[in-house]
Amino acid sequence: MNLFVETLGQGPDVVMLHGWGLHGGVFARVAEQLATRFCVHLVDLPGHGASPALPRFDADAVADLLAAHFPLPAQVVGWSLGGLIAQHWAARHPDKVKSLALVATSPRFVRDETWPHAQARASIEAVAQSLDGAFEQTLERFLALQMMGAPSARDTLKALRGELFSHGRPQGLLPALGLLLEADARALAGRIQCPAALFYGARDAITPIGAGRWLAESLPDAVLYEFPQASHAPFLSHEQDFVRALAEHLETQA
């Protein structure tokens, strides 16, 4: 399977994995700033952007696909769904992942009695049920939910909307949403040995900061960066602070 990948800059390899419903272009501004020091690869995950869909969006299969596409050791940045895939990649291919930067992500995206750091299942199911009949409106509502609570939500949401279909109409969002409903990667934490930097917004309703604190305690070598005023996309709402912290992490682990 051919993944759509945009590459910027030269230097140590950094692979960036986006969240559900979007594509690699969401990281364009961050990547441009990193490209003076790194070779940055912006991936469209299967079924997103310009990458073809898989019949079943399986986290292990996608991680294996990425490991084959990027055979040299790389640092991996994953946001939300991309962060879940990054955890699987690091656990399954420890020789291919030099470090992780996990942004507003979680090992589990559904709240239950054992995991309070997530949305109710019904919230994700409602998105899935409305995709067929109101595709664009559903994605825009989901974007608005991601920005809820951030002080610059209006400007950040405008930037996200501008990127939404710039790589074409995505073809495989429902299977990826199915993964978010069923995923539970908590057992992977003990298998991830590479250094990790964790970036979380205190106002995030999709992946509450408790998920980041759990990862900080469970991963063997992790540093947590909390953005008190940020929501689900600190790399957009607090771009300069985010880039500064991410670049420091990447340079330390290069």
Curated annotation (Swiss-Prot):
Its main location: cytoplasm. GO terms for biological process: biotin biosynthetic process. Signal peptide: none annotated. GO terms for molecular function: pimelyl-[acyl-carrier protein] methyl ester esterase activity. It is found in: Cytoplasm. Its EC number is 3.1.1.85. The active site is at S80, D204, H232. Monomer. Belongs to the AB hydrolase superfamily. Carboxylesterase BioH family. This is Pimeloyl-[acyl-carrier protein] methyl ester esterase. It comes from Chromobacterium violaceum (strain ATCC 12472 / DSM 30191 / JCM 1249 / CCUG 213 / NBRC 12614 / NCIMB 9131 / NCTC 9757 / MK).
